[in-house]
Amino acid sequence: MPIQVEVWGDYACFTRPEMKTERVSYDVMTPSAARGLLESVYWHPGLRWMIDRIRVCSPIRFTNIRRNEVKDVISANKVKAVMNGGTGELYLAASESIQQRAAMVLRDVHYVIDAHFEMTPAAAPGDNHGKFQDIVKRRLERGQCYSTVSYTHLTLPTKA
């Protein structure tokens, strides 16, 4: 059963893997990003989203932004050492480990995603296409989501 979702936002970043340190977006939304966006609206182990088509509804425009990011991570080894009686700090002071990074992102994005879903072996006996279709439609109409809907970064929210 096909589902069509219109999404738009001020900014989007579909990061190219070959750009290591600075984020540079693909020109359009990737199928995996569209699948992730739909999963943020409704996720269920008995359902797998399949992207059929992504239509670009606005001109492709880029802009450069600078973002503050935390450069450090808390290592698992450090956590284990403290749990076993060692000493150390188990926090990151964002003000001490902040760095600015440039990103080339898309601006004023607008897409229509055509998708469908397939049932997986993890579906319960009472699960069926009609049930999932109704749940997804209801969640989209009410603006509900399973997790925060965003274009790759939680700081780049989207509207559906």
Task: Give residue ranges: language-model regions.
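Short, well-ordered alpha-helical segments
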Residues: M29-G46
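Extended, compositionally biased
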Residues: V41-F117, A123
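N-terminal, Lys/Arg- and Ser/Thr-rich interaction peptides
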Residues: M1-T21
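A short secondary-structure junction signal
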Residues: A123-H129
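Short, cationic low-complexity segments
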Residues: F132-Y151
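Generic beta-structure capping elements
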Residues: W8-D10, H116, K159
